[in-house]
Amino acid sequence: MKYDDNNIFAKILRGEIPCKKIYENDYVLSFYDVNPQKKIHALVIPKGQYTDLDDFVQNAKEKEIYEFFKAISHVAKMLKVSNVDGGYRTLSNIANNGGQEVPH
């Protein structure tokens, strides 16, 4: 699957669509979902052009991968849902059969 520069996450990363930012560094952006499925529903997305988690893990630099997963833990602590606060769930929808709606 080819990366689409006009997907909603790419537009959020470029600042064309606003988001309620939680955390950002050189590699990731985290923000609240506009249609939350739970009381706390945060997204953590890489800033690189990857279509899904498989593409990211296979093609990103080790530093990008490290910073992505480190950011997930950091955001969980910020939102007070880390393992010491009761826990959280991570989810990545991959491709059509995995329920992916936006290829990013």
Predicted region positions:
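HIT superfamily nucleotide-processing domains
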Residues: 1-104
